[in-house]
């Protein structure tokens, strides 16, 4: 059975992680993340909480991968973007 190659990425403000893995055709997003070793390397990644995507498009852990996909693990937001914009606008008025 032919293999597919995918990249798994996770970015922090101070460091980015990029792993290339080979998987069998029919593998899922979750399979790629587990094969990348990032879950062991970064225990702060919780697949129950962190959203995932392929090329900035949100996907589910069970979605099947294609050759050349880039699986992205997103960090949870620590602040509401709308509220941050409001605060910056108020500061700019001063």
Curated annotation (Swiss-Prot):
Q: Which organism's genome codes for this protein?
A: Yersinia pestis
**Pfam families xrefs:** Ub-RnfH (PF03658)
Q: Which residues, if any, are the signal sequence?
A: none
List the InterPro entries hit by this protein, alphabetically. Answer: Mopterin_synth/thiamin_S_b, RnfH, RnfH_sf
Indicate what this protein is called per its UniProt record: UPF0125 protein YPO1103/y3077/YP_1053
By sequence similarity, the record places it as follows: Belongs to the UPF0125 (RnfH) family.
SUPFAM superfamilies, per database record: MoaD/ThiS
Q: What superkingdom does the record give? A: Bacteria
User: Which PANTHER family does this entry report, sorted A to Z?
Assistant: UPF0125 PROTEIN RATB
